[in-house]
């Protein structure tokens, strides 16, 4: 199994890079993980709803074009299914047993396009809270690492 994180936005603040890199390094011994940083559509100051929809479509095309054949696409969005850490660990164990490669899509500041939502095998919510997409990167990689630490009996998870 391989995990690829498809994320919109290439320039992140230093605190995001620091937090993400820490967990990214930790997870590698458990599962091969890759980050694909896709460009964010250029936005203006007073964008209309039609403009925002167009930006999401452009970013959605980037996400779909980055998918590899036979990858299971999972869309991260506030309206998705919530999982406990233990359920995530079980789900990841199942992916590994089935040999599934997984692509996790994080949208830009305006979310994911309808095309990405329709293409996704399932939708996952890290929280009912709306979060900035840079913060989602850190929360996602930490939860993936925590789930893998459970599956490998590593002492990181102490619930």
UniProtKB/Swiss-Prot annotation:
CDD domains assigned to the protein according to its UniProt record, in alphabetical order: RlmH-like (cd18081)
Main location: cytoplasm
InterPro entries linked to this entry: Alpha/beta_knot_MTases (IPR029028), RlmH-like (IPR003742), tRNA_m1G_MTases_N (IPR029026)
Keywords: Cytoplasm, Methyltransferase, rRNA processing, S-adenosyl-L-methionine, Transferase
UniProt binding sites for S-adenosyl-L-methionine: 76, 107, 126-131
Compartmental location: Cytoplasm
Enzyme Commission number, as recorded: 2.1.1.177
Membrane-spanning ranges: none
Subunit field text: Homodimer.
Purpose of the protein: Specifically methylates the pseudouridine at position 1915 (m3Psi1915) in 23S rRNA.
Family named by the database record: Belongs to the RNA methyltransferase RlmH family.
HAMAP family per the UniProt record, alphabetical: 23SrRNA_methyltr_H
Protein name as catalogued: Ribosomal RNA large subunit methyltransferase H
Organism expressing this protein natively: Acinetobacter baumannii (strain SDF)
Gene (name only): rlmH
């Amino acid at each position: 199994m391989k995990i690829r994180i498809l994320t919109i936005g290439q320039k992140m603040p230093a605190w995001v890079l620091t937090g993400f890199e820490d967990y990214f390094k930790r997870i590698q011994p458990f599962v091969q993980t890759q980050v694909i940083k896709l460009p964010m559509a250029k936005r203006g100051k007073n964008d209309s709803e039609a403009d925002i929809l167009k930006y999401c479509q452009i970013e959605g095309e980037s996400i779909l074009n980055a998918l590899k054949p036979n990858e299971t696409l999972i869309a991260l969005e506030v309206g998705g299914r919530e999982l406990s850490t233990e359920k995530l660990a079980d789900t990841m164990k199942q992916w590994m047993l089935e040999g599934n490669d997984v692509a996790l899509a994080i949208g830009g500041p305006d979310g994911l396009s309808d095309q990405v939502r329709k293409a996704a095998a399932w939708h996952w919510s890290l929280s009912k809270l709306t979060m900035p997409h840079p913060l989602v990167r850190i929360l996602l990689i930490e939860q993936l690492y925590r789930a893998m630490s459970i599956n490998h009996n590593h002492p990181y998870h102490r619930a």
